[in-house]
Amino acid sequence: MTVSLSESERLDERIREVVSRDLCSGCGACTLLDSGLDMRENEAGYLRPVRSTRGMVDTRAEVTFRKICPGVTVSSNRAYGSKRHPVMGSYREMWVSWALDSEMRHRGSSGGVLTALSAWLLESGRAARVVGAQAAPDPRRSIPVTITTRAEALAAAGSRYTPVATLSAPDVLLANSAVVAKPCEASALSSLVAPLKEQGIDPLILSFFCAGTPSAIATDRLLLTLGVESTTPLEELWYRGHGWPGRFTARDGATTVSVGYDESWGSALGPTTQWRCKVCPDGVGESADIVAADYWQVDGRGYPIFSEGDGTSALIARTKRGAEVIREAARAGIIHIEIARMDSLAAVQPLQRDRRSFLAARILGSILAGRPTPVFRGFGLIRLSLRHPLRAMSVSRGTYSRIRRARNASV
């Protein structure tokens, strides 16, 4: 006898496949297809979709899910009129930039440009709301937030190096919204709204360079090494900002503890990024209208220098709309912009440059070790890896060996 599954049951099956293969990025896009899904932190400290009830479900939820889920597929976006850089993606223009408001520049992760643009979009009426992320009531964790004022934009400034599912906020699909989201979220949202633009659902998407989502447990462990117990109530916790690159800082009222970015990200948080992020083809936000990144100063070897200073961003317009917004904001005195070459950004972003350059090799090693990856289209990954075949072979072998060792250790 053939059993007919409901749409929500079919969606659940597809979600289980992605989660069981460790390919979920925790973006929350699936919750927009079915109101009975919630994003919850699992035992490893990552956000995953969980069925809480049978809610309102899109009539083509399962089909749509297979088109938008970053754990299933990601495609390179090439907007009309854009140029193409092999590792930084498609773009129309690129600038060195920072917020002209000194408080926003100081509070933001690099130059404060996304915070400044968010506030200006609201104050100028170009957006009715900006959906992003901010600290939860317990600032050890992060939550989606709908921002409607300059003060709220400033309160949400700075990176949050802990899981948050920005797309679990339904406001992302309201007309006249802007959304500040991770690259995987930008990809899912761009794919989701593509057929909805005639209905007026076409959010301005702002993103940022992303090296991956660390486990929330890494934050707890880092705090413990700094003497902050899990039971200690925190008033504030910021990962970056308040300078550039800014220090990981926690405050419980009477006491403040902090550690530098190189140690917080490099030693404690970064090593815990989830598997899906390790095979990400798009840490540079190709599906967004506007993307910000750190425009690092580098040493003689080309590695970023993390000494404190005034924040400086690279600001990329990937679409005509994004370029228009950036130029209007500059004319309005919101941000400073100086035209720059994309090669100069690639030179100071070694992680993004190397990850994309050898991702095909990493994927090959992963598949040979029996670990599947999503389908990636349009990034030219094979061609990039073939430019340096010996190093690509080394990356493949290393990936294969690490996966096999991890599997044997867990048996």
Regions found by a protein language model. Give the residues of each.
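Long, compositionally biased charged/polar accessory segments in the mid-to-C-terminal portions
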Residues: 127-128, 231-411
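Local cysteine-cluster metal-coordination motifs and their immediate loop/turn environment
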Residues: 21-36, 64-74, 182-188, 272-285
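Extended interfacial segments that mediate partner engagement and assembly in macromolecular machines
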Residues: 88-108, 112-115
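Portal/gating segments that form or line small-molecule/metal binding sites
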Residues: 108, 113-173
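Intrinsically disordered, low-complexity linker/loop segments enriched in Gly/Pro
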Residues: 148-203, 209-215
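Iron-sulfur cluster-binding cysteine motifs and their immediate structural context
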Residues: 3-7, 25, 29-50, 62-85, ...
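Short, flexible loop segments at boundaries between secondary-structure elements
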Residues: 201-224, 322, 347
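Short, charged low-complexity linear segments at domain edges
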Residues: 1-13, 29-53, 156-160, 243-262
